Amino acid sequence: MGAITPIGNSVEEFWNGIKEGKTGFGPITYFDTADYRCKLAAEVKDFDPTQYMDKKSARRMEQFCQFAVAAAGQAIADAGLIMEQEDPYMVGCSVGSGIGSLQAMEREYDRLKEKGPGRVGPMLVPLMISNMAAGNVSIAYGLKGKSLNVVTACATGTHSIGEAYRTIQYGDADVMVAGGTESSITPIGIAGFSALTALSFSEDPQRASIPFDKDRNGFVMGEGSAVVVLEELEHAKRRGAKIYAELIGYGCSSDAYHITSPAEDGSGAATAMLNALKDGGVAPEKLTYINAHGTSTHHNDLFETRAIKLAFGEYAYDLKINSTKSMVGHLLGAAGAVEFVTCVKEIQEGYIHRTVGLRETEEELDLNYCRDSYEEEVPYALTNSLGFGGHNASLLLKKYME
């Protein structure tokens, strides 16, 4: 596994930060926010792309691609995957980005207005388009199998891993390098999400991203990438790979309701969760833990709560539910992948992190949202992602037993 996040630029740093309850929120440094209501973001700190590629390659990639190549490199090294010993056409890539490069668009649009269309850079399109994350990862590491770029807004990372899982199930790959990446903390990115009233305008880093809290007022935009190496079980055993957990279920649905709001009754998200459990052959009452989408917006946290109650009935009150976004913010297309890595570590270590900043909930939000952390066996973990456009995806993980 590999991770570039607002609280650490490796899985180890990220996970240590999670256990410490560390938050990655601070004033936006990429541009002057004097005219913006939103002042905070969860930026990646101290990232040096030349640790993962040469300077020429770094110059020919936008930051969302640099993050992806870095996280993928960490994951491939962690997996001990030696491409010279693999059939490269059976090793694929499914790394998605919800937006691509807003930086490239802003930069070249300014050039267009100032100097005319003849001065727009020839690299604009290949720098900008979101599929270049998967393209650059494949090029960097020689992955010649199926290469996908899933774009489902905030569900991108989860769908990317899910589609990689299906690819292996169908026999189209032995190994898939999968995850999500995003870097959209830019003037137009912040202005656009602010106009939707999706972002928190709090200037207090401790009270900005507070999923399920009654005072929540929007999400904090984050950035980064997480990538995992998914592998067919027998293939992994044959080469003596480290196996952290098993991915056993993938469920999807569409709300077909609204371009930004989840379905109010939670039916779409509930269907995705139940589909993942059915796919994995796990009865709902066997599940003890859900990593929620938990964005800290009024609608998401309320409607996701309704979805969990709809899917699990009274058993919903026995589940432990947390939100990793309480520490790293909303990484958009990378969010689901970062939360997948979180679930793997929680299963591996028998630890469920707390939802940082959660103080008091409103009447309908009456489930266990993990005000405190728990040290206990985690046999299964379900992780949810709900994207603009009504895209719902859930992944079911299982503790690996040799």
Ranges and model annotations:
Residues A68-L81, S130-A134, S138-E182, V220-A241, ...:
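Active-site-proximal alpha-helical scaffold in enzymes
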Residues T33-E43, G100-A104, S183-S209, G251-T271, ...:
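Active-site-adjacent elements of ketosynthase-type condensing enzymes
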Residues K22-G26, D204-G280, Y289, E402:
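Condensing-enzyme catalytic core mediating Claisen C-C bond formation in acyl metabolism
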Residues E114-G121, H159-G162, R166, E182-R238, ...:
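Glycine-/small-residue-rich "gating" segment that lines the acyl/pantetheine channel
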Residues E12-N16, Q103-P117, T167-Y170, I190-E203, ...:
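A glycine- and small-aliphatic-rich helix-loop capping segment at beta-alpha/alpha-beta transitions
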Residues V11-W15, K19-T152, T181-I190, K286-N300:
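Conserved beta-ketoacyl condensing-enzyme motif
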Residues M1-S57, E234-E246, V341-T355, K398-E402:
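ACP-dependent fatty acid/polyketide chain-elongation machinery
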Residues Q85-P88, G280-K286, Y317, L365-E402:
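Flexible, low-complexity linker/loop segments at domain and module junctions
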